[in-house]
């Protein structure tokens, strides 16, 4: 990922293909790599000219970035600023593949195709919301990757928050991409920043037995393979409704569920 010579060779190869075929091809760079490699890849793609289409009239070049995006808020913001300097916003796709799963897409269909639910899909009708993603399997051969990440960054700050935003979002004015993203973003902005005392009182983390003996895992690792967080939303629709986020590996069963407790 670090050597820019490889990017130059790739640019030359793609240019030869376009010339040979007499076309200006579309180019999509999909990054599903550990977060420490993003910076070098972004820079090398830009400096080698791979981010520029071969013609202003036809062909496009885009970059897709997968989770995890940075190690924390600071590094994620730094990477996003770098993306903005090296690429046009129209070229950038920040992807969470979990949104493509049928279970996730069914949340939207269930919520907004049943008009009778709308009046009670709020704090008046729902007493509690739980977002749970449990996996029966352990980390498998992902030790080197997972041990530097943990459950919260692997699935909590992306998959579970996407499920939460879909479950709690208000009805969009239109069912297009921009409108859906706008309503999901409102939910995420309503999440409070937990203090150290909040974390002690309302969060749990754990590690399954035998994790430290997994391949490529540090024997003294404190990386969590399980977490549970209770939080809430600071908005009028869901004010006062407890929200539970939970995920873990090597659990008794595999399941993805968004149970809600209806007020009686």
Task: Give the positions of each predicted feature.
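Secretory/organelle targeting and membrane-embedding segments
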Residues: 1-65, 69-264
């Amino acid at each position: 990922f670090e050597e820019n010579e490889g990017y130059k060779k790739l640019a030359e190869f793609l240019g030869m293909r376009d010339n040979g075929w007499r076309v200006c091809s579309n180019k999509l760079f999909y990054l599903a790599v550990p977060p420490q490699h993003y910076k070098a890849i972004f820079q090398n793609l830009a400096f080698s000219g791979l981010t520029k289409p071969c013609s202003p009239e036809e062909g496009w070049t885009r970059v897709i970035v997968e989770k995890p995006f940075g190690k924390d808020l600071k590094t994620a913001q730094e990477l996003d600023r770098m993306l903005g300097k090296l690429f046009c916003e129209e070229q950038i796709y920040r992807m969470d593949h979990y949104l493509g799963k049928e279970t996730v897409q069914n949340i939207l269909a269930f919520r907004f195709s049943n008009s009778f639910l709308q009046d009670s899909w709020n704090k008046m009708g729902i007493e509690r919301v739980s977002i749970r993603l449990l996996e029966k399997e352990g980390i498998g051969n992902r030790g080197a990757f997972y041990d530097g990440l943990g459950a919260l960054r692997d699935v909590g700050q992306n998959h579970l928050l996407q499920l939460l935003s879909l479950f709690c979002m208000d009805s969009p004015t239109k069912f297009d991409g921009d409108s859906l993203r706008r309503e999901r973003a409102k939910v995420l902005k309503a999440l409070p920043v937990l203090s150290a005392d909040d974390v002690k009182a309302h969060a749990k983390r754990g590690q399954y037995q035998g994790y430290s003996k997994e391949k490529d895992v540090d024997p003294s690792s404190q990386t969590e393979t399980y977490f549970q967080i209770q939080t809430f939303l600071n908005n009028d629709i869901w004010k006062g409704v407890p929200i539970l986020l939970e995920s873990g590996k090597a659990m008794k069963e595999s399941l993805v569920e968004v149970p809600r407790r209806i007020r009686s």
